[in-house]
């Protein structure tokens, strides 16, 4: 990697994993950098001081006058570019960037890029495993695992990145070999003024890409700008050329490519209709990147999924308990309910938490159609209750332990108790992992 010597003064805004990766990368490029963080003890501060003692660090409330002294700001994804100090710097002509924008300039291997309200971690992990099985030297990261800039140190002939809308806000042009917006549903409405702004941030993933992978079951997956060289599609019951789809016959539901049957959905270890969609998306991305089909199909068959995503915990007294703690928005929970309703029973849904300003109305129909009861926890329990209405019995719980107990009482043999909160976890838990682990422990202790 060549070293770029520049007189540009760069302020890295926000520390943590991403901020530290920017420090490592830009200092290695010979750039004059400083760091600002609104927190007095941000994560990574000790590592920064030990590794780069000469880098100036500004902690506490952002100072517009300080920011005005830099002609480039590299903003961590957790910080809104609408912050007055950042917006003021931009108005004065400073370039506002993020770590993914830096990565795109430096990467010397093709990029597969994945975003979406739901499923992106599963699809990113699947594509990474498929690439390894096909013999590629692949590095996987971005919004999961390793920050993108740190991947550059390891070398690769293919990068697979999960990207959030926050990361894409500060990415000018990614130039991916293949990119997809898996789906769009209300999320992060506490950061965006409306769904359109959130949608537009997601759409930036397609800038400069060579293959757009489009979900035919979600109109918001389609690129607004038609400047890509090729479209590949996926969706249910769409047996068309250049499309990964499904087809039913006497053997079951087939995943198909054009008119060719690839594998039966019953061969998958993953639960739920939404995971069939995730597999189709991964196959389309891998195909666009030139991966051989057979190793991709073998990975699809053996992949068991990720923790806290429609994860089966146990069956007790004829009732399945499912941990979908990663269902942190309404779209994810709707997909989980509709995918996991048992043939001979109903769903008892445990939901609630910090809704991040979301509209819960889309829950009303699937809850009425698929659920026997609703158990609500957390800050926005009342909002969910009002949105869903009186179609099913509702119970309020002050703790997850009480919620599990109430759900068990409401369940009948053949039912599924589903933790899929449609909300973030921070009002009651450290994060969604903590919420899911507590649910698993409680269920295993019944």
Swiss-Prot record:
The keyword Transport does not apply. Pfam families: Mur_ligase_C, Mur_ligase_M, MurD-like_N. Keywords: ATP-binding, Cell cycle, Cell division, Cell shape, Cell wall biogenesis/degradation, Cytoplasm, Ligase, Nucleotide-binding, Peptidoglycan synthesis. Coiled coil: none annotated. One of its GO terms (biological process) is regulation of cell shape. It comes from the Bacteria. Its EC number is 6.3.2.9. One of its GO terms (cellular component) is cytoplasm. One of its GO terms (molecular function) is ATP binding. It is found in: Cytoplasm. Cell wall formation. Catalyzes the addition of glutamate to the nucleotide precursor UDP-N-acetylmuramoyl-L-alanine (UMA). Belongs to the MurCDEF family. HAMAP family: MurD. This is UDP-N-acetylmuramoylalanine--D-glutamate ligase. It comes from Marinobacter nauticus (strain ATCC 700491 / DSM 11845 / VT8). The lineage of its organism: Bacteria, Pseudomonadati, Pseudomonadota, Gammaproteobacteria, Pseudomonadales. The gene is murD.
